[in-house]
Amino acid sequence: MKPANVTDRIVFLGSGGARIVVARQIRASGGIWFCLDGTMFLVDPGPGALVRMTASRHDLNPAELEGILLSHRHLDHAGDVNNMIEAMTMGGTERRGTLFAPSDALEGDDPVVLRYLRGFLERIVTLEPGGSYELGGVRFACPVRHRHRGEVYGFRFVVPGLSVSYIADTSYFPELAEHYRADVVIINVVRLEQSELDHMHVPEAIELVRAMKPRLAVISHFGMTIIRARPWVVAQEMSEQTGCKVIAASDGRELDLSEYRTGGPG
């Protein structure tokens, strides 16, 4: 049963990325809680997801989740996935929920999802490039494999009147704009300036926002260079350079997406 007062919203259980930021918890790393059209799910439960959720002032109950989505197996995105499966299923006493994850998070010599927990779930779905999926009232796709170590996907979610994209870790490539165009776009931007890392930096994010023209862009998953530059200042400068509304995620921040919903399908 979905709560009657649910609105379209997202809550950032963390806004940090990169190894030093996560290891020192300079910014939290718990992922993103989504509620779209009454369907609640968690994306990328990194270290501290369960603690951040249960301590949140936003009344987040893991037993109300319908699913967990992993963009990839790296610990800053999947470190708390097993704890969250336990919490979602009440320690395995209620078999429920769906886990969506790339194949290398589930199989091979070093999977990040413990095998003994898998029977707690109703479904486990392996993500594929170009794949389309459903969870509750939400349709979503993994439009393209990202250019990052391992098997990495982003998500484009659609409910009636609203589309939301999450662009997970990747090096920049121009086709991202076409694949992830949406009303609201969340972009993982780790670096302030160009580097050899396979992560997006601010000038590339500016180019991407210009091409996509979302109604709202949210930058998150910050490394130290952006944190030192103050993410809210970086976001304001991006707004000025792109002509689009750009804001910076912060730990515990809730965004009401209802103002971005229109009358037609996403």
Question: Where would I find each of the regions flagged by the language model?
Answer:
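Conserved beta-strand hairpin/beta-sheet module of binuclear metal-dependent hydrolase folds
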Residues: 2-57, 151-168, 184
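Binuclear metal-ion centers of metallo-dependent hydrolases, dominated by the metallo-beta-lactamase
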Residues: 130, 175-184, 191-266
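Short helix-capping segments at alpha-helix termini
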Residues: 90-94, 116-120, 239-245
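Active-site metal-binding motif and surrounding structural segment of the metallo-beta-lactamase
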Residues: 48-98, 181-184
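Active-site neighborhood of phospho(di)ester-bond hydrolases with catalytic His/Asp-centered motifs
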Residues: 42-46, 66-76, 102, 164-170, ...
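Metal-dependent catalytic neighborhoods of phosphoester/phosphodiester hydrolases
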Residues: 79-88, 112, 227-236
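Metallo-beta-lactamase
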Residues: 2-3, 94-152, 159-160, 252, ...
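Short beta->alpha connector loops
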Residues: 47-48, 105, 146-149, 168-173
